[in-house]
Amino acid sequence: MRVTQGCFSFLPDLSDEQIKLQVGYAMSKGWAVSVEWTDDPHPRNSYWELWGLPLFDVKDPAAVMYELAECRKVNPEGYIKINAFDASIGTESCVMSFIVQRPINEPGFYLERNEVQGRNIQYTISSYAVQARPSGDRY
């Protein structure tokens, strides 16, 4: 099951040249760019591991591409995304985020139903990858 989070998630994976163009666009807007990775892509897991520090004053997309390449070396089967942060007054938020790498095999999620007080049903989404292996050894 293909994880769909962020911009471009329903499109085919971006090439490195397309990623570089998107990073260049973010930098042309004055946005700070960062690289993050995880092995738990649960939809509510919004806090991925930050790779290095955000690249605040970097003006060349090649620097981001270098950091992305280093992150890919260390996390060859993890999820990696690029974020762009707009620090301008009134926004101060992540304005663009997209996955740039994913594992070859994405096992997907399962729905767990639990009956609670008053015959109410609670639903939980869990990842098959998280269920099968500990953190750091999932892909």
Curated annotation (Swiss-Prot):
GO MF annotations, alphabetized: ribulose-bisphosphate carboxylase activity
Main location per the UniProt record: plastid
UniProt KW keywords: Calvin cycle, Carbon dioxide fixation, Chloroplast, Photorespiration, Photosynthesis, Plastid
InterPro entries documented for this protein: RuBisCO_ssu (IPR024681), RuBisCO_ssu_dom (IPR000894), RuBisCO_ssu_sf (IPR036385)
Subcellular location: Plastid, Chloroplast
Function: RuBisCO catalyzes two reactions: the carboxylation of D-ribulose 1,5-bisphosphate, the primary event in carbon dioxide fixation, as well as the oxidative fragmentation of the pentose substrate in the photorespiration process. Both reactions occur simultaneously and in competition at the same active site. Although the small subunit is not catalytic it is essential for maximal activity.
Note: In this alga, in contrast to plants, the small subunit is encoded in the chloroplast. The basic functional RuBisCO is composed of a large chain homodimer in a 'head-to-tail' conformation. In form I RuBisCO this homodimer is arranged in a barrel-like tetramer with the small subunits forming a tetrameric 'cap' on each end of the 'barrel'.
Name of this chain's protein: Ribulose bisphosphate carboxylase small subunit
Organism: Pylaiella littoralis
High-level lineage: Eukaryota, Sar, Stramenopiles, Ochrophyta, PX clade
